[in-house]
């Protein structure tokens, strides 16, 4: 899998599969419309959407563009909570556990450019001591500790055990489904798989590039905010030097960004980055040596419109 975030550029293409998909609770015969990406839990007044504990199914048609002939094609999910099973024309092609990390499925051996297929995604929101987040299906209280005799805890256990509804032993609502974007992606067959940048305040930028394919020249360039080159190196790993670097800071008007441009054969990838130092001294959090105060922390990334 490529760990790089998808992008459209001169060598890469992507198609967003977001929109209205078919949806049903596993075991039902009828399909109904659902928005993707989004948690399904709040998309209907039907209590089953909020209370579901178990598997649901999504379905839609996908087509590989004919113009992608000769390119590597893959299907990328940015997140499906909490475990996923992916099927193409009814055949399992991938599984994944964990609802907060992306995963990809190579399509070259499964579909030809110009071909259409039926994509099905099974999502399961049940969590236990082997999943992230860790939880239990109503057997114990928050964080796995058992607190007998507390009425609310005992009622929650009974509700989960008797009705199988979505009340796992965690301290947040268990939003689930295809929660982040789904895309079809095309890259050259020899492509940039990953890149790492470690900038320092003195202008040094340590870099490493991981590629898929035969060895070939790799060009790494750094462009300033105006798009002008300020450093370059032909190597798979090394150190770039930026003279008189501009620092990234979170204050208005100061978040200066450079762009690292990597070229490998026919592939190209650009990654914005900033030069800054983060340090903790006693009770002070420092960015580039200046104190920074945090305001309004949020424990969970819940949205009243989209869920998680």
Please identify what each model-predicted range represents:
Residues 1-308:
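Secreted/periplasmic carbohydrate-active enzymes, especially glycoside hydrolases
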């Amino acid at each position: 899998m490529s760990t790089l975030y998808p992008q459209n550029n001169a060598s890469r293409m992507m198609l967003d599969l977001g929109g209205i998909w078919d949806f049903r609770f596993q075991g039902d015969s009828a399909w109904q419309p659902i928005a993707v990406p989004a948690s399904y839990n709040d998309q209907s007044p039907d209590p089953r959407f909020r209370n579901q504990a178990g598997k649901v199914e999504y379905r839609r048609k996908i087509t590989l563009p004919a113009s992608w002939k000769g390119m590597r094609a893959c299907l990328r999910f940015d997140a499906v909570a909490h475990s996923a099973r992916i099927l193409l024309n009814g055949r399992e092609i991938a599984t994944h556990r964990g609802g907060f990390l992306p995963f990809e499925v190579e399509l070259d051996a499964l579909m030809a450019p110009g071909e259409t297929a039926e994509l099905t995604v099974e999502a399961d929101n049940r969590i236990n001591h082997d999943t992230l987040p860790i939880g239990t299906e109503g057997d114990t209280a928050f964080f796995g500790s058992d607190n007998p005799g507390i009425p609310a805890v005992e009622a929650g256990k009974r509700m989960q055990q008797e009705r199988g509804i979505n009340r796992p032993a965690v301290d947040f609502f268990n939003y689930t489904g295809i929660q982040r974007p789904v895309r079809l992606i095309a890259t050259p067959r020899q492509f940039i798989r990953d890149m790492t940048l470690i900038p320092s305040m003195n202008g040094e930028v340590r870099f490493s590039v991981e590629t898929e394919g035969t060895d070939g020249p790799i060009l790494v360039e750094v462009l300033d905010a105006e798009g002008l080159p300020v450093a370059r190196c032909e190597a798979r790993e090394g150190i770039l030097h930026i003279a008189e670097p501009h620092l990234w800071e979170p204050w208005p008007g100061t978040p200066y960004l450079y762009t690292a441009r990597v070229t490998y054969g026919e592939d190209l990838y650009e990654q914005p980055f900033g030069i800054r130092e983060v340090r903790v001294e006693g009770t002070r959090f420092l960015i580039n040596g200046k104190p920074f105060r945090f305001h309004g922390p949020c424990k969970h990334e819940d949205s009243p419109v989209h869920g998680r």
